[in-house]
Curated annotation (Swiss-Prot):
Pathway assignment: Lipid metabolism; sphingolipid metabolism
Region of interest (Disordered), ranges: 209-237, 250-320
Organism: Rattus norvegicus (Rat)
Intramembrane segment boundaries: 11-31, 65-85
GO MF terms held by the record: identical protein binding; metal ion binding; neutral sphingomyelin phosphodiesterase activity; phosphatidic acid binding; phosphatidylserine binding; phosphoric diester hydrolase activity; sphingomyelin phosphodiesterase activity
Residue list for modification Phosphoserine: 178, 289
Record-linked InterPro entries: Endo/exonu/phosph_ase_sf, Endo/exonuclease/phosphatase, Sph/SMPD2-like, Sphingomyelinase/PLipase_C
Predominant location: Golgi
One of the record's GO cellular component terms: extracellular region
Catalyzed reaction equations: a sphingomyelin + H2O = phosphocholine + an N-acylsphing-4-enine + H(+); N-(15Z-tetracosenoyl)sphing-4-enine-1-phosphocholine + H2O = N-(15Z-tetracosenoyl)-sphing-4-enine + phosphocholine + H(+); N-(tetracosanoyl)-sphing-4-enine-1-phosphocholine + H2O = N-tetracosanoyl-sphing-4-enine + phosphocholine + H(+); an N-(acyl)-sphingosylphosphocholine + H2O = an N-acyl-sphingoid base + phosphocholine + H(+)
Active site: 639
Protein name: Sphingomyelin phosphodiesterase 3
Length: 655
């Protein structure tokens, strides 16, 4: 299948569209700014608390007539542009595909050659998040603002979180708690160049945006600094290190056994990555607040590159650190922190290391999507953005916004399909909400069979009273997915050209598994075909599952304005009741604060990550290895991202 790299089939239509949008944009921007000036966020209200009341009134009286005058002047040009823009949308393609070719060991071509489908299985990590990148006036309804700056910041945090090396540390002694269990996959144990020194007892902590792994290097950084000298082909991000720590000497770590050569992790140049938001000034002790892009100081260990590697220590140098992989017995290596669960689960201050696939919702603003794409291309080679339709299409209502879906992948994308839900109503009908279906290649067998997986990203109808509409959309989602798999599958069943190893659905479904008003969606047949790792049954959640929708009134409270603070708050029941959104009752009663004291559960979980156990290649299975709720985007969106790591292996292989 040919992937569309431009929204229009020829340059003539593209130029005409650019001219028409240039005529519309001033009017669009003025309306957005005018409305936004009357919708302050709680953060802005606190900033203005000490200002005299007359100052705000003076600014409003002064600038409102100016905006209105400019708006009236821009209206004729906007009308002229709309006359050309609207019919052009019938020729517009439903997405734009971008590839920034990466020839490094972490690039897509190199990743395909790593796994042949033989021997041990392979894990794939998926993440989904609603990032609320709407036009600023609409974003303020969710108590977030400055969409363009947030887009840069979100991309930067995701990139730096995913680019960390995947390190797992197991502590033998229950009394040795010197290493936080808050982020079991985000600890780095630096070793000397000889690879024979013990893991240091003291650890230097750092913010996630300060860490730049090789996979997280921005394209412009590589152009400025040049490639790192002496890079080896085996230093990919897929390398992981398992460090086993004993508790015989208190907080002192034991020396790792039997170093495995070639297990490396790379640390890029220090300092702040390119693309940092200009109005975010980093300060000591400030981790992830609105005044700093720092995302956390609790769970990530920063290696001192120049000290042990013998490098020059210059800011532009890319030093490499050797990580000694201890030989751990298979039973010990697979030991889980939660014996009562088949997989590890946590509230993490970071996106998972070695993130393979990212699905985002509510990336509605085109300029924000471009900034987000620029940041994420430093880690993800393949990106689909500006997904959706505009104008009038078929029997659908007029669409002012696209679907808001955004997809990024480290693996090559083979096929893509998009469908718009035709039954949207109310304000949701103005956006072309739908489903994006993707087929990705993750490897090839020695017999040249492609190893592939299917991913569906969606965003369902939002108004809480429209359960029937969401159920219809879930029906359409299943039908479209079945058609997509049928149209993109290999023709021969006896000798297939492809092996399907995973089938994942993720996105914001706008209903939870604890509200009595959402019973219709909770019992949908989708949950019989796809497994929800957080769910026991209709209306019944697993005890460790928490809500993913934050209470927007508390987004900028000091207790939750940094990833680390939000992580700590969500690990306590009192904190969850204070800062997560809970089901709203249609019956009259107490207010939000008083009602929460009577509620049970852990909040509204409306962001889902589902995987299929059936429909995969015979003798293959996909099992959840890790599941995490992520706080790294605190202060930037009103949702918690979620991530899932699937272990794919042949059925006959024993764990």
């Amino acid at each position: 299948m040919v992937l569309y790299t431009t929204p229009f089939p020829n340059s003539c239509l593209s130029a005409l569209h650019a001219v028409s949008w240039a005529l519309i944009f001033p009017c669009y921007w003025l309306v957005d700014r005018l409305v936004a000036s009357f919708i302050p966020t709680t953060y802005e209200k606190r900033q203005r608390a000490d200002d005299p009341c007359y100052l705000q009134l003076f600014c409003t009286v002064l600038f409102t007539p100016v905006y209105l005058a400019l708006l009236v002047a821009a209206l004729p040009f906007a009308f002229l542009g709309f006359i050309f823009w609207s019919p052009l949308q019938s020729a517009r393609r439903p997405y734009s595909y971008s590839r920034l070719e990466d020839k490094s060991p972490a690039g897509g071509a190199a990743l395909l050659s790593e796994w042949k489908g033989t021997g041990a299985g392979k894990s794939f990590c998926f993440a989904t998040a609603n990032v609320c990148l709407l036009p600023d006036s609409l974003a303020r309804l969710n108590n977030v603002f400055n969409t363009q700056a947030r887009a840069k910041e979100i991309g930067q945090r995701i990139r730096n979180g995913a680019a960390r090396p995947q390190i797992k540390i197991y502590i033998d002694s229950p009394t040795n708690t010197s290493i936080s269990a808050a982020s079991f996959s985000s600890l780095v144990s630096p070793q000397g160049s000889d690879g024979a020194r013990a893991v240091p007892g003291s650890i230097k902590r750092t913010a996630s945006v300060e860490y730049k792994g090789d996979g997280g290097r921005h394209p412009s950084d590589e152009a400025a600094n040049g490639p790192a000298s002496g890079e080896q082909a085996d230093g990919s991000l897929e390398d992981s290190c398992i460090v086993r720590i004993g508790g015989e000497e208190g907080g002192r770590a034991q020396e790792a056994d039997d170093p495995a050569p070639g297990s490396q992790a790379r640390n890029g140049a220090g300092g702040t990555p390119k693309g940092q938001t200009p109005n975010h000034n980093q300060r000591d002790g400030d981790s992830g607040s609105l005044g700093s892009p720092s995302a956390s100081r609790e769970s990530l260990v920063k290696a001192r590159a120049g000290q042990d590697s013998g490098g020059s220590g210059e800011p532009g140098s890319n030093s490499k650190l050797l990580y000694k992989t201890s030989v751990v017995k298979k039973a010990a290596a697979r030991r889980r922190r939660h014996p009562d669960e088949a997989f590890d689960h946590e509230v993490s201050a970071f996106f998972p290391a070695n993130l393979d696939f990212l699905c985002l919702q509510e990336v509605f603003d085109k300029r924000a999507a471009a900034k987000l794409k620029e940041q994420l291309h430093g880690y993800f080679e393949y990106i689909l953005y500006d997904v959706g339709v505009y104008g009038c299409h078929g029997c659908c209502n007029f669409k002012c916004l696209n679907s808001g879906l955004f997809f990024a992948s480290r693996y090559p994308v083979m096929d893509v399909a998009y469908h718009c839900y035709p039954n949207g109503c109310s304000f949701d009908a103005l956006a072309s909400k739908g489903a994006l279906f993707l087929k990705v290649q993750v490897g090839s067998t020695p017999q040249d069979q492609r190893i592939v997986g299917y991913i569906a990203c969606t965003h369902l109808h939002a108004p809480p009273e429209d359960s029937a509409i969401r159920c219809e959309q879930l029906d359409l989602l299943q039908d479209w997915l079945a058609d997509f798999r049928k149209s993109t599958s290999s023709t021969s069943t006896a000798n297939p050209e492809e092996l399907v190893v995973f089938d994942v659905i993720c996105g914001d479904l706008n209903f939870d598994n604890c509200s009595s008003d959402d019973k219709l969606e909770q019992q949908h047949s989708l949950f019989t075909r796809y497994k929800d790792p957080c769910r026991l049954g209709p209306g019944e959640e697993k005890p460790w599952a928490i809500g993913t929708l934050l209470d927007i009134n508390g987004l900028y409270d000091e207790d939750v304005c940094t990833p680390d603070n939000l992580q700590k708050v969500l690990e306590s029941e009192e904190g969850r009741r204070e800062y997560l959104a809970f089901p709203t009752s249609k019956s009259p009663g107490a207010g939000q604060k008083g009602r929460k004291d009577l509620l049970k559960g852990n909040g509204r979980r409306i962001d889902y990550m589902l995987h299929a156990e059936e429909g995969l290649c015979p003798d293959w299975k996909a099992e959840v290895e890790e599941f995490s709720f992520i706080t790294q985007l605190s202060g930037l969106t009103d949702h918690l991202p979620v991530a899932m790591r699937l272990m794919v292996s042949a059925g006959e292989e024993e764990a």
